[in-house]
Design a protein with these regions (language model features):
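C-terminal regulatory/interaction regions
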Residues: 69-106
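Metallo-beta-lactamase
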Residues: 1-55, 59-62
Length: 106
């Protein structure tokens, strides 16, 4: 999936392998150099070209690094909030971080 302007929902990708596959799919999409990508989940006006793909890809990379650096969801949440201040849908970040750190089953 592709997102824009909101925290990316990662609760359904609970393994590094599934998130890597997601990244690979985004790479394939970007390689087609689309004029516009309409994200499945977004707020505001999506950017032209691959902007939404690039945003999602960057977010996933940062999420992966935060997971590697922190054992608990609070650390992941705080890291992503600092990296994306004011980004909407913090509840998606919070639930996704809890699921991906094993604090919550999904």
């Amino acid at each position: 999936g592709v997102a824009w302007g909101i925290h990316v929902w990662t609760a359904d990708t609970q393994t590094p392998e599934s998130r890597k596959q997601w990244q690979e799919t985004l790479e394939h999409m970007a390689a087609h150099k689309p004029e516009r990508v309409i994200p499945g989940h977004y707020l505001g006006t999506p950017p032209a070209g691959t902007g939404a793909i690039d945003f999602t890809r960057d977010y996933l990379q940062r999420f992966e690094k935060a997971l590697a650096a922190h054992k608990d969801s609070a650390g992941v949440i705080n890291t992503l909030k600092k990296q994306y201040p004011g980004l909407a849908d913090e509840s998606s970040l919070e639930l996704s971080a809890k699921v991906n750190t094993g604090e919550m089953k999904w």
